[in-house]
Amino acid sequence: MRIADYSVTKAVLERHGFTFKKSFGQNFLTDTNILQKIVDTAEIDDQVNVIEIGPGIGALTEFLAERAAQVMAFEIDHRLMPILADTLRDFDNVTVVNEDILKVDLAQHIQNFKNPNLPIKVVANLPYYITTPILMHLIESGIPFCEFVVMMQKEVADRISAQPNTKAYGSLSIAVQYYMTAKVAFIVPRTVFVPAPNVDSAILKMVRRPEPAVAVEDENFFFKVSKASFTHRRKTLWNNLTGYFGKTEEVKDKLTKALDQAGLSPSVRGEALSLAEFAGLADALKGQGL
């Protein structure tokens, strides 16, 4: 029997008198086939350390621990600590940390792996309400995670993996794809969770690029420009950029020159631009002193 078997999950929750907290976005997966598929997608073996976020009662942790060198799981809900101590008692390669992943000194914790030099993968069922902040926090942490295989709301996975000229494409697509390749591996129906969420989920596989997707002079400025370009999706690049930089004649003159230098029409929309085009635009705007 597995932790994720519905009867086991139910018994564990009842035994510990656990009640779900909406504020933590708790939805526990009760499908062992999907858990197996997640671990297979992540290609976990004994030469990999794993960071897990939000282990719940340990359903995914169990599958990870059977194959990984070590698993370090971060759980914000202190009420789950005794449950995890119970369900994962047979594994000596699992460490559960009762901390908020957004506030913890992750680099320090990683040094506690027996072999901290092994590749590190992030495998997790992320809380829906805080998926994007967690992902960006980890991606921008400076820690060289080689891969992420994470479950999230399908809509968010679609946005992250979206390509130009699609409805889902936006500043989040650019922010993630600058650092990583991103592809939806498979869909997870809402019916396999306790309690069932209101939407379907997706497993997103993201692999870190050896170098960022495009070269830019100023990364922060590049992200600001891309974000500004999507402020109002139905507006043109010109309207969004003047909304961000200002509408004085001097600014308009600089914008005109930068767009011309980048080879872009003022009437194009942000959703039509590739990462390379955003890079060219950001560098041109920077060159104009904006």
Swiss-Prot record:
SUPFAM superfamilies: S-adenosyl-L-methionine-dependent methyltransferases. The lineage of its organism: Bacteria, Bacillati, Bacillota, Bacilli, Lactobacillales. InterPro entries: KsgA/Erm, rRNA_Ade_diMease-like_C, rRNA_Ade_Mease_Trfase_CS, rRNA_Ade_methylase_Trfase_N, rRNA_adenine_dimethylase, SAM-dependent_MTases_sf. It is found in: Cytoplasm. Keywords: Cytoplasm, Methyltransferase, RNA-binding, rRNA processing, S-adenosyl-L-methionine, Transferase. Specifically dimethylates two adjacent adenosines (A1518 and A1519) in the loop of a conserved hairpin near the 3'-end of 16S rRNA in the 30S particle. May play a critical role in biogenesis of 30S subunits. This is Ribosomal RNA small subunit methyltransferase A. Belongs to the class I-like SAM-binding methyltransferase superfamily. rRNA adenine N(6)-methyltransferase family. RsmA subfamily. CDD domains: AdoMet_MTases (cd02440). SMART domains: rADc. Its main location: cytoplasm. It comes from the Bacteria. The gene is rsmA.
